[in-house]
Amino acid sequence: MAVTSLRRKLLLCAALGLLLVPGCHTVPQALPYAEAVRTPPEDVAGMRARTVTVEADHSVTSYRYPELGGAHPLTVRVRTLMARRQTDFLEDLPERGRPELHQDVSVLAASSQVVGVRLTAATEAGMSRDLTADTLWYDADSGEVLPWTALFRDDEAIERAHLALARVLRDGYNLPAQQLPGVVGEAARDQAALDEPAPSPSASPRGRPTQAPGRTEFSDPDRVREAAERWTDSPLRDAAFSTAGGLAVRMDPAQVPGAGMVREVMVPIEAADAEDLLSELGYRAREAALSGNDPGDDLVPDGDSDTPGHTLDCSQLKCVALTFDDGPGEHTDDLLDILAGYDAHATFYVLGSLVEEFPEPVERMAAEGHELGNHTWKHDDLARMPGNAIKKDIGRTNEAVRELTGTTPPTVRPPYGSLNGTVRRSVDQPLVLWDVDTLDWQSRDPEAISEHALTHTAPGSVVLFHDIHRTSVDAIPQVLAGLHRQGYHFVTVTDIFGGQGLEPGEVRTDARLT
C-alpha cells in the first residue's frame, strides 16, 4: 500500500539527517521545529467556511466552521462544540468590560477516507489572552467523528509519543527532567523509574493509564473516546502532521523555557519515531495531509446546501426557536435585517394569500436560511372545517410557498392553535404550536413583549410572535440581545426538533430539554 512507499521515503530522508520538508530540502533551525500541515477550509476543494459574528455591548463572539453539506457529521460536531463553548463564555461574563471570544478552524487532512480539523478558541479580556485548541478526525468508513487519540494505535503508543516529546525538549531545548511539563514530564520520570530496580514489579507508574492484558489497539470508537478522557492534559490534543511526515505538536511557550518570545512552539516528533505509533486511521490521515487535501465528492454531500442552521445539535445546546405568524407583511423586511445582526434563524408561519402579495420577503427568508411554515391560506379556523377543505387549504398554501422557494413548508401551525382529530388526520405535516406566547398581538408594547420572552424562554422553547405588528418587530432587538447574553442559539423549528422524526399530524409545542 502507499504507506509502505511513504515509509521508505521518510526513512531515507531521516537517514540523511535532514529536516524533512517536501522534496527533502534542508531548512536550518536554531531549535527543533516542525512545520504543521494546516490549511484554511476554503482552500480545500469542495469545502466552504461560514463565519458567525455577534458584536454586543457586553461581548464580541465569532466562530468559523467548515461546511461539508447541511448535515455532515463533522460540520454538526464542530459547530455544536463551538456553540457550546460560546454559551459557556457568555454565561460567565464579568460585570464589567467587553471580553471577546474568537473561534476558528483549520484543516489538518482531507481525503475521501478521512478529514481532520483543528479548532481554536482565543479569548481576550482586558490584558488577559488565552488560546486553547483541540483536534477532531472524521472517519468515513465508520461515519464517526473521533478525538485525537484515533491517530494512535493504543495507550502505549501515546506514552511513547510523550517520551519522544520529552527527548526533543530535553536534548533540543536543554530542559532538565524536572522542568519537563505536564504528562510529558510524568512519562519521562515514569520511564526513568522503570529503568531502575522497582520495589514492586506489579506497581503501575504514577499518572499512567493501566493497560488491560492483551489490549493492543483502540479497536472501537468508544475506546478511542475513553482514551481521550484519560489523556485530557496531553499536548498531543493539538498535534498535526508535519510537512516532514512526522508529527508537529503545539506547546505553550510558557512551558518551554528558552523558546523565546514566540506565539507557539511546534515540537517535532520525527517521521521515523512516529511510524510505529500510528493507527490505521493515522496512516490514512498522514497520507491525506501530505497529498494535498482533496476530500472528494463522496465526502462532501449536499455541497450546494445553503441551510447552515441544520448544523447544530440542539440536544446539547441552549436553542430557542423564534416563530412569527400571520405574515409576510410590510414590517417583515425590517425584521429580517434585525435577525441578521445575530445570525438568528427563525421560522415564519406564512399565510398563502400574503405570500402572493409579498413575494420578495418570502424569497429573502429562504435565501437567508430561515424556515417557512404553513399557517393556512387566510387564517381560517381549521377545527371548523371538514377534512377535504383542510387538505385543499393546506395544499394551496404549500404550493404558493413551493412556487417561490422551491421547498414545501415542513410544518403547519393551525390558526389560533385550534385543532381536533379531523385536523390531525387531514394534514400531512407535523403540527407545531408554541410554549411561550408573548401576547404581542394583545399588548402591542415592545417592553412587555420582550420581557415576557426573556423571562419565560427555556432551552428548547418555541416562542410565538407576529411580524405583522410594528410593536412586535420593535421588541425583537431586545429579545435577541437578552437571549444571546444568556447563551442561546436561534434556530428554526426543524432544527430544534432535529433528529426526532416528527410524524404527519403529530402535535408538538416545544423541545424543552428539562
Where does each model-flagged region fall?
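Solvent-exposed coil/turn segments that connect beta secondary-structure elements
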Residues: T120-A122, D141-G143, A254, G327, ...
